[in-house]
């Protein structure tokens, strides 16, 4: 059995030094999902996190990981620390705590606002697709931070569709067009409330949750300006 604290600390040191590796050393590599989740718990206990990323799996389940650090504002420059790629997402911020075992009504009521967001997409592994799933889960599912746009109240944000356009230096870099979820993202929140409590960080007011890639991951280029536009607002950053 690995030391979850040692693995979390090793990965964090790599992040701060801007280094990548082929794979975790054998004595730090989680053997299964439970050990990877223990690494997430150790990370949350030791390092700042503004919330969670969550995404649906191909078999109808969910995956989640803590977000790294504090959110960056719109218009941020990533020139000094550019990740390899970015995803365009819908984010939400909680206005109240949400405990495990919550109902759909409680999950909906806990949402304070919706936002356009960018997930900064990076990994401590040189080839993240070449390492095992538990190692990726321990590395917080490739999260390198988040940029969050202006808030929209639920009554303002919820529409029949989510339409997003993404541009690099004014050129089309991706589009997304899909129905707004029937449950208003409640099912994912209900699952995440249980998950977060088990990791030792129950969902609370102010937590930011990004809900899965709508566009991307899109590889980033240096010296470019990226902008997303949708009914949730406009959000941009530079590299």
Feature names for model-found ranges:
Residues 2-184, 217-221, 225, 232-239:
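Catalytic-core "active-site belt" of small-molecule-metabolizing enzymes
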Residues 185-217:
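A conserved acidic, glycine/proline-rich C-terminal tail/linker
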């Amino acid at each position: 059995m690995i030391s979850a604290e040692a693995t979390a600390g090793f990965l964090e040191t790599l992040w701060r030094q801007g280094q990548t590796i082929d794979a975790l050393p054998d004595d730090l590599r989680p053997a299964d999902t439970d050990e990877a989740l223990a690494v997430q718990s150790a990370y949350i206990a030791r390092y700042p996190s503004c919330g969670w990323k969550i995404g649906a799996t191909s078999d109808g389940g969910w995956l989640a990981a803590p977000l790294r650090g504090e959110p960056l504002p719109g218009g941020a420059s990533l020139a000094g620390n550019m990740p390899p790629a970015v995803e365009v997402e819908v984010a939400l911020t909680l206005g109240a705590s949400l405990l495990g075992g919550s109902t759909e009504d409680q999950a909906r009521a806990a949402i304070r606002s919706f936002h356009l967001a960018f997930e900064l997409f990076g990994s401590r592994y040189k080839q993240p697709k070449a390492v095992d799933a538990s190692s990726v889960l321990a590395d917080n599912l490739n999260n390198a931070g988040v940029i969050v746009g202006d808030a929209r109240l639920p009554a303002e944000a919820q529409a029949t569709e989510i339409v997003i356009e993404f541009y690099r230096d004014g050129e089309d870099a991706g589009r997304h067009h899909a129905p707004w979820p029937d449950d208003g993202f409640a099912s994912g929140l209900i699952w995440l409330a249980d998950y977060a409590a088990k990791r030792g960080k129950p969902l609370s007011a102010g937590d930011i949750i990004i809900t899965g890639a709508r566009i991307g991951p899109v590889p980033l280029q240096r010296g470019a300006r990226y902008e997303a536009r949708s009914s949730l607002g406009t959000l941009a950053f530079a590299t």
